Amino acid sequence: MKVLFVTSEAYPLVKTGGLGDVAGALPAALRDIGVDARILLPAYPDAMRRARLTGKTVPLGNPLGVGETRLLEGTMPDTGCPLWLLDCPAMYERTGGPYMMYSGVDWPDNFRRFALLSKVAAMIGTAGDLMDWRPDVLHGHDWQTGLVPAYLNAWGARRPPFLFSIHNMEYRGLFGPEILDLIGLPRSQFSINGLEFHGLVSTLKAGIVYAQAVATVSPSYAAEIKTPVGGQGLEGLLQARAGDLSGILNGIDSNAWNPQTDPYLAAPIDGADPAPGKRINKDMLKRRMGLDADGDRPLFGLVSRFVAQKGIDLVVAALPGMIAGGAQVAILGAGDTGLEAALNDIVGRYPGAAAVHVGYDEHLAHLIEGAADFLLVPSRFEPCGLTQLYALRYGTIPVVRRTGGLADSVSHLDDGPNGTGIVFDHALPDALEWAIGRAMTLYRDKATLNKVRQRGMSQDFSWKRSAKEYLRVYGSMVGGDVHRP
């Protein structure tokens, strides 16, 4: 089985969020179970610096009329997974992020940049002599690759089949209809049964419409996006594609996130008895973040973007009561300046009980995951989520809202003998405060606390598990008829 991953980011070459983690780790996990998985990624400056290039190039001419284009062969620096960088200096050789300028404004030619990625992926899939390698399946990710099957549809190509993975429905890839002429797609696709969405082109919709199969990053999120709450206006289409829609929970990199060998921890954490290692790491985190070291107090961690989706406003509302009840809080993240200011205000009012580090620090992220007694993940919606998976692996008990991947990965400790965390239902301050109170009650029962930690650490959230599920989807696509709208 040969699979080409088409993606706009892949860790450690370039990453802005969870998509980068998936696209970096899943191909390697698939290769471990016998799949010939390879990655196609734009040749951003960071990717060019970090990839291990072989020196082999394949000229592609000027397939989109935006400049000379070529493929650069290489491998991923950490896993050795085969890689092709799509080199078009006019599109990708620029300072800033993969999607935005340093100012935070989207690149105005994003439609061209990712149409080129999509068109070249379709070319690789249909031109057997292009790379001396032809994929059995094309696997694209999010709106940036939604035009891959649109090109295949326009060319009348029935193979290879395309799997479209949705990591976040909020990003729909919306552009004016005039782009179709500029990127070489027929106007006939601009219809309610094609890629038209309220008078605009939606590349996310294109992926859903023209792909043979659709996947998302957790079973619960697959159900949620078929409803008005989660579907972002595309729920009817997703209901129609329900038979082709899979929800596969993301995995984690069990080498990078290994509580026995993590170099960022002050001491290893043993799944058979997490308490001693947790205690040492907790002491280290308190010293690093300036939290009071005296007393046996529950420590809550939060590692998150500071945005409304993540429920940070709920945390702001709950913090004074938590601290009054004897808890301490260690927070890492960045985002909305108003939420940053609110968190910093609480730190100023409760020195020694609350600490915030604004920004991202990989060392501190690992230390919080390993040191905290509980991890707060009160998201309003969460397609999958990774921090709760890291927490479980490190013996930290997640406090999560019942949504998306949080619901699939954390079971409430009062719902049966195998509970691994504390789960609440509503995105309201009172609901989070109830969950925090339940956590503080658990903390006082040290024997039960350690058992819940042990259960969490015994869970399997490896990419190998996820890779086997994707392999089953690929197999069904290769053996079945290709969906056409």
UniProtKB/Swiss-Prot annotation:
The signal peptide stretch is none
Q: Lineage from the top down?
A: Bacteria, Pseudomonadati, Pseudomonadota, Alphaproteobacteria, Rhodospirillales
InterPro entries reported for this sequence? Glyco_trans_1, GS/SS, Starch_synth_cat_dom
A biological process (GO) of this protein is:
glycogen biosynthetic process
Which is an annotated GO molecular function term of this record? alpha-1,4-glucan glucosyltransferase (UDP-glucose donor) activity
Parts of the chain that traverse the membrane: none
Q: What is this protein called?
A: Glycogen synthase
Q: In which pathway does it act?
A: Glycan biosynthesis; glycogen biosynthesis
UniProt keyword annotation of Transferase present? yes
